[in-house]
Amino acid sequence: MRLSAEGLKDRAKWEEAGYALPKFDREKVTEATKENPFWIHFGAGNIFRAFQANVVQNLLNDGILDRGLIVAEGFDYEIVEKMNHPHDDYTILVTLKADGNIEKTVVGSVVESLTVNTENASDFARLKEIFAKDSLQMVTFTITEKGYSLVNGKGELLPDVEADFVSGPEAPKSYIGKVAALLYARYQAGEKPVAMVSMDNCSHNGDKLYAAINTFAEKWEENKLTDAGFRAYVNCKEKVTFPWTMIDKITPRPDASVEELLKKDGIEELDPVITSKNTYVAPFVNAEECEYLVIEDAFPNGRPELEKGGLMFTYLQSFDIILRETNNENHYCRSRSSR
């Protein structure tokens, strides 16, 4: 048993071993997603694979969605090259249930994976193509709080950021510079609306993403490296929004005991990879069952019905109330799961 499109053709063997498999036509979903993408996510890490990707899978299984996810990795390209591509973007999700049982799911909602690398001409051209699509509704991020910072611990501009300010959006080197360049491509395609949604677990995450993107828009406009209207586009809430979110999902690094459990089921090629950037990644993710994601409902190009997958949408003034409620609920849930 191998985790790949070919290996999953023998569905009976996987199901006999207790794995829940995708119930949708993945080839059809892949084709529709590539033609009319609605959601691209930056950050191919464990929380995305265990949470957002699984939510979309459930909605695909239920026929609520007809398109899947595209993921882009901008910090460690080897995650895509050594894990996503060899396994055809499939992941095994192992969930520890509140009653102590284990649930095993093959997640296949991610149908395309790319590196956010301006030196990879085909990948970056594809990213620009995605950003130019009318259908794109949301661009989401789990890149850690540090990923939004343009300065070092001393408050000095990071070298790549400083270089990007003067070189412009053609071939930026910094992570946020690349994202800003992609948003500029959407602006050039007709000032199309989109929600830029940080899903990192940090306070006022939407403001952090906005501040970083807006700084690039300001500097590029000052240096006459973009059209004069780009900064206004970034600051027009009818065109571009930066919703706040709150997220909680425990996804520790891939566990050796989980790996052994899967190997006993007969699954091959499960060995984790430690990349040159010291990222520890495996074909599987292990996670606790408890989770929540609350999103400020500010989507200028519309959004899918993600509330049917368990996500919560609210308005900014309701965040404090929901934060207290979700924290209490999650504390209760964790207390039960630890018994």
Where are these regions (language model features)?
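Substrate/ligand-engaging "lid" and interaction regions
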Residues: 1-42, 46-339
